[in-house]
């Protein structure tokens, strides 16, 4: 442990030495002029010891490592690091630095003795040192304690002179917790993910991390290359923070399914959302081919405008007949209608596919706008015969599709003629038939004869 007699003999050395070195240790607290002899001697000893240990620590690493570290640290601006705000002020930065309490007699003794002992026994752990110093202090007699008591009194008077209106305000216990969460959220701000971020239930963490976003927010809105358009749209609404937190959760959890019932519809861009309110959540799964592109080639005459919504294909060939309707062409396959043969297992991909920026940038569509339905329903009479022949042609396949072609498409959309789309395959039992249905819906354009187009070849669909 520690030689008691030696430690006992050490403290009452010259009172000026230990005591004044004390006032020098906490020079942020008191402006008491240190007596040169004691404090500078001690300070020099301590400084020398510290410099030696720093050099020794440096020697542990090879020169190349040290050079690399200094090279990295040199280029980093440490003023950008968000500093966690400690203290119970609710995150408000205090203009003036914290004024510490004046040291009492034990602190005067402990700091001076700790400095001396740390130089003599560098292997001693600080906590063990403190325990030992406390025991020793209790064993000291009044006469031995007197120099420290006098120095503490002098520090107190000096402190009162320096800070006349000082009032001791002990910290509240909970400040430890807030400090920790501040620093944590500072690191979160530093590492916002590069993947797409969705705001599914981003109310999470808004209240919790509210205060620190004011202090730690030094970088701009997140614009990684894969950020979808909805993110930019929301960034203008000032909800960047929740996006970050939520995006981190979604990316970490391996792109879980988004529950569309939780999406705040008002925040998504209007063209995506114009008709989404009546869609079933599971309906999007029909339109998902595995690779997002075509699997079956079709005749050029029948798929002049193969519309893809998140990799889906509504082959709206009627678009050619009416100039007002936009041509939705998938960027890679203008003459191929996507066949979702593997539509079943692809549930996680729909989220990235449906909101991914490539579809936003390369096609001018969200879900079909209302004008489109008007234009396509105008073609309904022309194409009913064709779709009927399509239906009868694969009525002999694994299921009877004629009910899918019944004259009642898109009954969920009340304003449109009941002849275009209806989704009877909302239910999982009908889901595998989406591919032949969609390919059968590749209607011939208005100017081509409706009777002489070749039937595409269909593969048998199996649920994996």
UniProtKB/Swiss-Prot annotation:
<dbReference type="GO" id="GO:0014015">
    <property type="term" value="P:positive regulation of gliogenesis"/>
</dbReference>
<dbReference type="GO" id="GO:0072197">
    <property type="term" value="P:ureter morphogenesis"/>
</dbReference>
<feature type="region of interest" description="Disordered">
    <location>
        <begin position="444"/>
        <end position="464"/>
    </location>
</feature>
<dbReference type="GO" id="GO:0043066">
    <property type="term" value="P:negative regulation of apoptotic process"/>
</dbReference>
<feature type="region of interest" description="Disordered">
    <location>
        <begin position="1"/>
        <end position="55"/>
    </location>
</feature>
<feature type="compositionally biased region" description="Basic and acidic residues">
    <location>
        <begin position="206"/>
        <end position="215"/>
    </location>
</feature>
<dbReference type="GO" id="GO:0010628">
    <property type="term" value="P:positive regulation of gene expression"/>
</dbReference>
<dbReference type="GO" id="GO:0010817">
    <property type="term" value="P:regulation of hormone levels"/>
</dbReference>
<dbReference type="GO" id="GO:0045165">
    <property type="term" value="P:cell fate commitment"/>
</dbReference>
<comment type="function">
    <text>Transcription factor that may play a role in central nervous system, limb and facial development. May be involved in male sex determination. Binds the consensus motif 5'-[AT][AT]CAA[AT]G-3'.</text>
</comment>
<dbReference type="GO" id="GO:0005667">
    <property type="term" value="C:transcription regulator complex"/>
</dbReference>
<dbReference type="GO" id="GO:0043565">
    <property type="term" value="F:sequence-specific DNA binding"/>
</dbReference>
<keyword id="KW-0804">Transcription</keyword>
<dbReference type="GO" id="GO:0060009">
    <property type="term" value="P:Sertoli cell development"/>
</dbReference>
<dbReference type="GO" id="GO:0072034">
    <property type="term" value="P:renal vesicle induction"/>
</dbReference>
<dbReference type="InterPro" id="IPR036910">
    <property type="entry name" value="HMG_box_dom_sf"/>
</dbReference>
<dbReference type="GO" id="GO:0060041">
    <property type="term" value="P:retina development in camera-type eye"/>
</dbReference>
<feature type="compositionally biased region" description="Polar residues">
    <location>
        <begin position="354"/>
        <end position="366"/>
    </location>
</feature>
<dbReference type="GO" id="GO:0048484">
    <property type="term" value="P:enteric nervous system development"/>
</dbReference>
<dbReference type="GO" id="GO:0048469">
    <property type="term" value="P:cell maturation"/>
</dbReference>
<dbReference type="InterPro" id="IPR009071">
    <property type="entry name" value="HMG_box_dom"/>
</dbReference>
<dbReference type="GO" id="GO:0072289">
    <property type="term" value="P:metanephric nephron tubule formation"/>
</dbReference>
<feature type="region of interest" description="Disordered">
    <location>
        <begin position="354"/>
        <end position="374"/>
    </location>
</feature>
<dbReference type="GO" id="GO:0003700">
    <property type="term" value="F:DNA-binding transcription factor activity"/>
</dbReference>
<dbReference type="GO" id="GO:0001649">
    <property type="term" value="P:osteoblast differentiation"/>
</dbReference>
<dbReference type="GO" id="GO:0007165">
    <property type="term" value="P:signal transduction"/>
</dbReference>
<dbReference type="GO" id="GO:0000987">
    <property type="term" value="F:cis-regulatory region sequence-specific DNA binding"/>
</dbReference>
<dbReference type="GO" id="GO:0090190">
    <property type="term" value="P:positive regulation of branching involved in ureteric bud morphogenesis"/>
</dbReference>
<feature type="short sequence motif" description="9aaTAD">
    <location>
        <begin position="418"/>
        <end position="426"/>
    </location>
</feature>
<dbReference type="GO" id="GO:0033690">
    <property type="term" value="P:positive regulation of osteoblast proliferation"/>
</dbReference>
<protein>
    <recommendedName>
        <fullName>Transcription factor SOX-8</fullName>
    </recommendedName>
</protein>
<feature type="compositionally biased region" description="Low complexity">
    <location>
        <begin position="303"/>
        <end position="315"/>
    </location>
</feature>
<feature type="region of interest" description="Transactivation domain (TAC)">
    <location>
        <begin position="347"/>
        <end position="464"/>
    </location>
</feature>
<dbReference type="GO" id="GO:0060221">
    <property type="term" value="P:retinal rod cell differentiation"/>
</dbReference>
<dbReference type="GO" id="GO:0045444">
    <property type="term" value="P:fat cell differentiation"/>
</dbReference>
<feature type="region of interest" description="Dimerization (DIM)">
    <location>
        <begin position="55"/>
        <end position="97"/>
    </location>
</feature>
<feature type="compositionally biased region" description="Gly residues">
    <location>
        <begin position="40"/>
        <end position="51"/>
    </location>
</feature>
<dbReference type="GO" id="GO:0048709">
    <property type="term" value="P:oligodendrocyte differentiation"/>
</dbReference>
<dbReference type="InterPro" id="IPR050917">
    <property type="entry name" value="SOX_TF"/>
</dbReference>
<feature type="DNA-binding region" description="HMG box">
    <location>
        <begin position="99"/>
        <end position="167"/>
    </location>
</feature>
<dbReference type="Pfam" id="PF00505">
    <property type="entry name" value="HMG_box"/>
</dbReference>
<dbReference type="GO" id="GO:0005634">
    <property type="term" value="C:nucleus"/>
</dbReference>
């Amino acid at each position: 442990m520690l030689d008691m007699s030696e430690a006992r003999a050490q403290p009452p050395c010259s009172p000026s030495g230990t005591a004044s070195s004390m006032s020098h240790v906490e020079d942020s607290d008191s402006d008491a002029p240190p007596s040169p002899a004691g404090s500078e001697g001690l300070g020099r000893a301590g400084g020398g010891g510290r410099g030696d240990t720093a050099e020794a620590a440096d020697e542990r690493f090879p020169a190349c490592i040290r050079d690399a570290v200094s090279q990295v640290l040199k280029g980093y601006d440490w003023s950008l690091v968000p500093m966690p705000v400690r203290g119970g002020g609710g995150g408000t930065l205090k203009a003036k630095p914290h004024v510490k309490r004046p040291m009492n007699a034990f602190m005067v003794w402990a700091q001076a003795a700790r400095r001396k002992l740390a130089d003599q026994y560098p292997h001693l752990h600080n906590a063990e040192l403190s325990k030992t110093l406390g025991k020793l202090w209790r064993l000291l007699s009044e006469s031995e304690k007197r120099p420290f008591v006098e120095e503490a009194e002098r520090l107190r008077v000096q402190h009162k002179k320096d800070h006349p209106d000082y009032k001791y305000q002990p910290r509240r216990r909970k400040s430890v917790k807030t400090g920790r969460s501040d620093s944590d959220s500072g690191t979160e701000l530093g590492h916002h993910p590069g993947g797409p971020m969705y705001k599914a239930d981003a109310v999470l963490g808004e209240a919790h991390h509210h205060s620190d976003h004011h202090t730690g927010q030094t970088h701009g809105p997140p614009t990684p290359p894969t950020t979808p358009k909805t993110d930019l749209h929301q960034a203008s609404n000032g909800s960047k923070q929740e996006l970050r937190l939520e995006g981190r959760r979604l990316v970490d959890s391996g792109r879980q399914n988004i529950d569309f019932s939780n999406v705040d519809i008002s925040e998504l861009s209007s063209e995506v959302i114009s008709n989404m309110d009546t869609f079933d959540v599971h309906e999007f799964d029909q339109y998902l081919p595995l690779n997002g592109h075509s699997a079956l080639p079709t005749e050029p005459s029948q798929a002049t405008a193969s519309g893809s919504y998140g990799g889906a294909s509504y082959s709206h060939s009627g678009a050619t007949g009416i100039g007002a309707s936009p041509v939705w062409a998938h960027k890679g396959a203008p003459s191929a209608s996507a066949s979702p043969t593997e539509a079943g297992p692809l549930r996680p991909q729909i989220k990235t596919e449906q909101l991914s920026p490539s579809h936003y940038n390369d096609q001018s569509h969200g879900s079909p706008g209302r004008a489109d339905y008007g234009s396509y329903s105008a073609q309904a009479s022309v194409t009913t015969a064709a779709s009927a022949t399509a239906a009868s042609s694969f009525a002999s396949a694994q299921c009877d599709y004629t009910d899918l072609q019944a004259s009642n498409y898109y009954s969920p959309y009340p304003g449109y003629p009941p002849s275009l789309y209806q989704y009877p395959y909302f239910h999982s039992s009908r889901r595998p038939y989406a591919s032949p249905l969609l390919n059968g819906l590749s209607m011939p354009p208005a100017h081509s004869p409706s009777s002489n187009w070749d039937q595409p070849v269909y593969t048998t669909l199996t649920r994996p």
